[in-house]
A protein has these predicted regions:
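Core alpha/beta nucleotide-donor-binding catalytic domains of modification enzymes
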Residues: 1-72
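Active-site cores that bind ATP or allylic diphosphates and position pyrophosphate for catalysis
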Residues: 56, 63-67, 71-188
């Protein structure tokens, strides 16, 4: 972005498109505002645009996703996407169509290759499975930052008080992934 004299920006949805399509909740790793904050503070991106995923978004032709949303609305001049990025109605847009569109319309385009750690592809699905299994440290390694969760503290059975370790029972925000039931060491 600096080389082009532009501000860096990231685009994300307020929820997983899979949730809207299937009607089944997909647990989020963060709230949209937490995600935007992580992208800004930990990855140095200047702007983060969070767009609602709805029926209009779901049925938008892939060409319109680029031309109307990314270029016209957000003034994109260079697009960066992951190797498995799919977009537009019925996921008809893919990285090859993105590259082709960008080349034909004078836009820059970079595709980020698959990222692996310890022989495993880094993906939100895998990270969710680690968190659901209670493997928070390993999930944090795949995230590239410590996993954090916010929620409401509620009264429990006083087990922590009896064992001399102060504990807090946390109810995560709605739609946020629930960790495996257990006791976790944290920092406030």
């Amino acid at each position: 972005a600096q080389e082009r004299g532009c501000r860096s920006a990231a685009f994300t949805f307020d929820r997983s498109p899979r949730e809207f399509v299937t009607g089944k909740p997909v647990p989020l790793l963060t709230t949209p505002s937490e995600r935007a904050n992580i992208i800004r503070t930990q990855y140095g991106v200047q702007e983060v645009f969070v767009e609602p995923f709805d029926r209009n978004m779901m049925t938008m032709p892939w060409e319109d996703f680029i031309s109307e949303l990314l270029v016209r609305k957000y003034h994109a001049v260079h697009l960066v996407a992951g190797h498995d990025f799919r977009f537009g109605h019925k996921n008809e847009g893919d990285v090859e169509k993105l590259r082709s569109y960008c080349a034909a319309h004078g836009l820059g385009c970079d595709i980020i290759p698959r990222v692996e750690k310890d022989g495993v592809t880094v993906s939100s699905t895998y990270i969710r499975s680690l968190l659901e299994a209670g493997e928070v440290k390993r999930a944090s390694e795949f995230l590239g930052h410590y996993f954090s969760v916010e929620g409401t503290v509620c009264h429990g059975e006083g087990i922590g008080k009896k064992s001399l370790f102060p504990t807090a029972n946390l109810i995560p925000e709605e739609h946020i992934i629930a960790l495996k039931r257990g006791v976790y060491a944290t920092r406030a």
